[in-house]
Amino acid sequence: MNKLIAFDCDSTLSGIEGVDELARLAGDDVFRQVEDLTNQAMNGEIPIEEIFSRRLELINPTRHQCLEIGKAYLEEIEPTAKETISKLKKQGWECIIISGGFVTCIEELAEYLEISSIEAVPLYFNENGDYLGFDSDYPTTRNGGKPELLKKVAKNTSAEHVVMVGDGVSDLETFGIADRFIGFTRYAARQQILENSPHIASELSQVLDILKDC
């Protein structure tokens, strides 16, 4: 039996919001603006597509800064993530990351967790590492993108059980494609997640108990 579990990255596998930390590197004013936009999007107050390019234009990140955020993801990794993912894989689960974050930032964390499949937004840089743009057609740059990707991966892997773990409204959108949605509240307890998630976990190790009958 093929089993697929997808994890959000920011405020789930790691305690930080990568885009906010990139903004912090650009200065206090940029950080405040970007943090506000991120919170509004994660709470479902404004569509993701409305803020995606605005945040990156404000930040103008370099490749080096993105790699620094990769290190920050590792430093702030959810304490039970490594062991939980290792146990899930031993139980036959295919573990993937589906994120509205950036591939360049997430790769180091994924490698540490031994997750080979990352569905996240590609950024483009010139030969000096200066920011050129992002893939504006990538599904997770808009609302509805995560269920689209989860459906594609589930089909490609012929998964009979599909699970999503995440903290935000964009993650909750996958419920229906995912036969189980687990709202994650360790770092952010968002009202829509608390009210609408069939399962809640405050640490990733609790995912193992929730899925013990699968």
Predicted feature descriptions by range:
Residues 1-3, 8, 194, 204:
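N-terminal glycine-/serine-/threonine-rich phosphate-binding loop
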Residues 3-122:
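Alpha-helical substrate-recognition element adjacent to the catalytic core
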Residues 72, 76-94, 101-214:
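C-terminal cap/substrate-recognition subdomain and adjoining C-terminal extension
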